[in-house]
């Protein structure tokens, strides 16, 4: 008989009230009533009697080795002994017959859930994978007639999802059970109550029973658990599958999810904010429907959004009002005193905060020294050199060597910077000589590194500039206010093409 096809041995008798002993070397633990028996290994050959010697006679070793190599190199011509077909082996009928679907019910069982100790029993771990389908047989066993038997038969025909992983050892066993291992490291379990051993983990049966009893819990208790965890977010709905598993539907995105949306940290934060708001709470004993809780959560979110919009609108109104006040202050300046240093300093100081706060996107305040045409262009557009027929701006350049800006204007208007000529030095300039110096370029701009102003573009028809006037006036003393203002201008990071200074 083939050693791999021996029937399982009969379990050894055990005394009442004593735990089963450790299985012997080379054999599995004994099997109790209704439990599968582990496969036994072939018995070791008996030793010869005393005084007898066993003599092995072998032929030519080289011939035997050549035969082995020929069998591998030339498998077609080699004399390979044929194996015994599966049909000729002494296998039970259930090995060739797959189980029928009706055999899972209790009504199809003929032995009322018990099996004899000598009946060959097939467990999924020790049976052919081709004859048994995964998940087709629940923790029962097969008899030669293909009927499910075993103590694990349940009164219902419901098929549960089986776990495909081993339960860790730290999970406690039921009362009266003990886990042990064979010499080969395979685990088995001892039942001290029935004085039996088995390969099946009793914790799996406990988990399956818990899964069976979980859907049968009263709906009132389930509703209490759901209400205790809080209402669902707006647009979410809780549903249940046919197997009793809970899932969640998002009506906004038309999606479903197994994860509870109330566990999302974003929803928890919004719920905390809504709870901290001074909202009138209902009486503690009054029942609250889940729909009312959802509406309350949505109303709190809407109130927060409305409050945020109101704050943004109020901020925008304050910014527009500040700009309007600055424009009115610039319009009310007398044109006769527009060229005074105080007025120029006021215009420069009022222009910088607006550009820094608005990120350089708002219209700069027009300088009082500008002409009427430039003042109108500055008020109506974001760039004083756009939307004009006389001034043209260069395209955006990213390879410019200047570090202050990527935009430049090829030509500066003649009367654009003529109003700041009094701010260059501390020298006293006679007011009567001011009209004759309207076209004079300010000296303090030449002293700033990085400006590189092309003075040739500022020459007019009646402009006569001497050579000494083109030299930078570093030797002249500059006032501290002018230096502070220009440092703030150069340090600004957001003064691009809307800047009141033009970088060439």
Swiss-Prot record:
Changing residue 86 to A: Complete loss of interaction with TEAD1. Part of a complex when phosphorylated that contains DSG3, PKP1, YAP1 and YWHAG; the complex is required for localization of DSG3 and YAP1 to the cell membrane in keratinocytes. Binds to the SH3 domain of the YES kinase. Binds to WBP1 and WBP2. Binds, in vitro, through the WW1 domain, to neural isoforms of ENAH that contain the PPSY motif. The phosphorylated form interacts with YWHAB. Interacts (via WW domains) with LATS1 (via PPxY motif 2). Interacts with LATS2. Interacts with TEAD1, TEAD2, TEAD3 and TEAD4. Interacts with TP73. Interacts with RUNX1. Interacts with HCK. This is Transcriptional coactivator YAP1. Induction: Induced in the hours following cyclic mechanical strain in keratinocytes. Keywords: Activator, Cell junction, Cell membrane, Coiled coil, Cytoplasm, Membrane, Nucleus, Phosphoprotein, Proto-oncogene, Repeat, Repressor, Tight junction, Transcription, Transcription regulation, Ubl conjugation. Changing residue 202 to A: Loss of interaction with ERBB4, loss of transcriptional coactivation function toward CTF and reduced interaction with PRRG4. It is found in: Cytoplasm; Nucleus; Cell junction, Tight junction; Cell membrane. The modification Phosphothreonine is found at residues 63, 110, 119, 154, 412. The modification Phosphotyrosine is found at residue 407. Changing residue 61 to A: In YAP-4SA; prevents phosphorylation by LATS1 and LATS2, promoting retention in the nucleus. Prevents phosphorylation by PRPK4. Belongs to the YAP1 family. Residues 86-100, 298-359 form a coiled coil. Increased expression seen in some liver and prostate cancers. Isoforms lacking the transactivation domain found in striatal neurons of patients with Huntington disease (at protein level). Residues 291-504 are annotated as: Transactivation domain. The modification Phosphoserine is found at residues 61, 105, 109, 127-128, 131, 138, 164, 274, 289, 367, 371, 381-382, 388, 397, 400, 403. Changing residue 95 to A: Complete loss of interaction with TEAD1. The gene is YAP1. Its main location: cytoplasm. Transcriptional regulator with dual roles as a coactivator and corepressor. Critical downstream regulatory target in the Hippo signaling pathway, crucial for organ size control and tumor suppression by restricting proliferation and promoting apoptosis. The Hippo signaling pathway core involves a kinase cascade featuring STK3/MST2 and STK4/MST1, along with its regulatory partner SAV1, which phosphorylates and activates LATS1/2 in complex with their regulatory protein, MOB1. This activation leads to the phosphorylation and inactivation of the YAP1 oncoprotein and WWTR1/TAZ. Residues 37-51 have a biased composition (Low complexity). Residues 355-391 have a biased composition (Polar residues). Phosphorylated by LATS1 and LATS2; leading to cytoplasmic translocation and inactivation. Phosphorylated by ABL1; leading to YAP1 stabilization, enhanced interaction with TP73 and recruitment onto proapoptotic genes; in response to DNA damage. Phosphorylation at Ser-400 and Ser-403 by CK1 is triggered by previous phosphorylation at Ser-397 by LATS proteins and leads to YAP1 ubiquitination by SCF(beta-TRCP) E3 ubiquitin ligase and subsequent degradation. The lineage of its organism: Eukaryota, Metazoa, Chordata, Craniata, Vertebrata. Changing residue 407 to E: Enhanced interaction with TP73. The keyword Protein biosynthesis does not apply. It is linked to Coloboma, ocular, with or without hearing impairment, cleft lip/palate, and/or impaired intellectual development: An autosomal dominant disease characterized by uveal colobomata, microphthalmia, cataract and cleft lip/palate. Considerable variability is observed among patients, uveal colobomata being the most constant feature. Some patients manifest intellectual disability of varying degree and/or sensorineural, mid-frequency hearing loss.
């Amino acid at each position: 008989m083939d050693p791999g096809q021996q029937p399982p041995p009969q379990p050894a008798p055990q005394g009442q009230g004593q735990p089963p002993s450790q299985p012997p070397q080379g054999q599995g633990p004994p099997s109790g009533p209704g439990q599968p028996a582990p496969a036994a290994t072939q018995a070791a050959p008996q030793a010869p009697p005393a005084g007898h010697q066993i003599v092995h006679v072998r032929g030519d070793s080289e011939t035997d080795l050549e035969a082995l190599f020929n069998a591998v190199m030339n498998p077609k011509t080699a004399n390979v002994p044929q194996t015994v077909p599966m049909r000729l082996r002494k296998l039970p009928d259930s090995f060739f017959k797959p189980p029928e679907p009706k055999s899972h019910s209790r009504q199809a069982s003929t032995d009322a859930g018990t099996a004899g100790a000598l009946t060959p029993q097939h467990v999924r771990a020790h049976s052919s994978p081709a004859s048994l389908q995964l998940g087709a047989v629940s923790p029962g066993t097969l008899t030669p007639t293909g009927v499910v038997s075993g103590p694990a038969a349940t009164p219902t025909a419901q098929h549960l999802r089986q776990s495909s992983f081993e339960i860790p050892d730290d999970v406690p066993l039921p009362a009266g059970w003990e886990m042990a291992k064979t010499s080969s490291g395979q685990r088995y379990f001892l039942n001290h109550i029935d004085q039996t051993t088995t390969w099946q983990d009793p914790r799996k049966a406990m988990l399956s029973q818990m899964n069976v009893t979980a859907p049968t819990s009263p709906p009132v208790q389930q509703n209490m658990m759901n209400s205790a965890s809080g209402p669902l977010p707006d647009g979410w709905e809780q549903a249940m599958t046919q197997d009793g598993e809970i899932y969640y539907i998002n009506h906004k995105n038309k999606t479903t999810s197994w994860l509870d949306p109330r566990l999302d940290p974003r929803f928890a934060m919004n719920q905390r904010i809504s709870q901290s708001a001074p909202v009138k709470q209902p009486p503690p004993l009054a029942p609250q429907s889940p729909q009312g809780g959802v509406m309350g959560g949505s109303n709190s979110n809407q109130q927060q959004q409305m409050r945020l919009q109101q704050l943004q609108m109020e901020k925008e109104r304050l910014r527009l009002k500040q700009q309007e006040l600055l424009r009115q202050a610039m319009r009310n300046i007398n044109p006769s005193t527009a060229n005074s240093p105080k007025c120029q300093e006021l215009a420069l100081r009022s222009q910088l905060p607006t550009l820094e706060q608005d990120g350089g996107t708002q219209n700069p305040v027009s300088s009082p020294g500008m002409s009427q045409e430039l003042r109108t262009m500055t008020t109506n557009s974001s760039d004083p050199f756009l939307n004009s027929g006389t001034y043209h701006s260069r395209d955006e350049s990213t390879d410019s060597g200047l570090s202050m800006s990527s935009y430049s204007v090829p030509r500066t208007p003649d009367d654009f910077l003529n109003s700041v000529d009094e701010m260059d030095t501390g020298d006293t300039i006679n007011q009567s000589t001011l009209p004759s110096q309207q076209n004079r370029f300010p000296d303090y701009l030449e002293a700033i590194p990085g400006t590189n102003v092309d003075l040739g573009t500022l020459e007019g028809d009646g402009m006569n500039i001497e050579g000494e006037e083109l030299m930078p006036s570093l030797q002249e003393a500059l006032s501290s206010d002018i230096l502070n203002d220009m440092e703030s201008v150069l340090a600004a990071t957001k003064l691009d093409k809307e800047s009141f200074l033009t970088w060439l």
